[in-house]
Amino acid sequence: MAHKKAAGSTKNGRDSNAKRLGVKRFGGEQVLAGSIIVRQRGTKFHAGDNVGRGKDDTLFAKATGEVAFVTKGKPLRTFVTIKAD
C-alpha cells in the first residue's frame, strides 16, 4: 500500500496576522475629534452622539470631549457617545 505520510504538514502552517481590534479609548477618557475609539468587526458597539462609524465599522470621535459607553434600548445595545466640551 502506498502511503502519503507527511502531506498534512504541507497543507497546514498558515496563520493570519492579528488585526489589533478592540476598544482604543475607554469611558472617561478625553479624545480629540477624529480619534479612533473602537476598532471592530460588525457592530458590537453602536455610534451615539458625536461619534461616527467608518466603512469597516470603526467608531471615531466627531467632536472633542469625554468618551462614555451607554447601554440602552430593546434589544440592549451599547452606544459610544462623546460628551462635548
Curated annotation (Swiss-Prot):
Keywords of the record: Ribonucleoprotein, Ribosomal protein
HAMAP family, per database record: Ribosomal_bL27
Species: Hydrogenovibrio crunogenus (strain DSM 25203 / XCL-2) (Thiomicrospira crunogena)
Chain spans, region Disordered: 1-21
Family: Belongs to the bacterial ribosomal protein bL27 family.
GO CC annotations, alphabetized: cytosolic large ribosomal subunit
Protein's name in the database: Large ribosomal subunit protein bL27
Pfam families: Ribosomal_L27 (PF01016)
Listed PROSITE patterns: RIBOSOMAL_L27
Gene Ontology biological-process annotations: translation
Keyword Ribonucleoprotein: yes
Lineage top rank: taxon: Bacteria
Gene Ontology molecular functions: structural constituent of ribosome
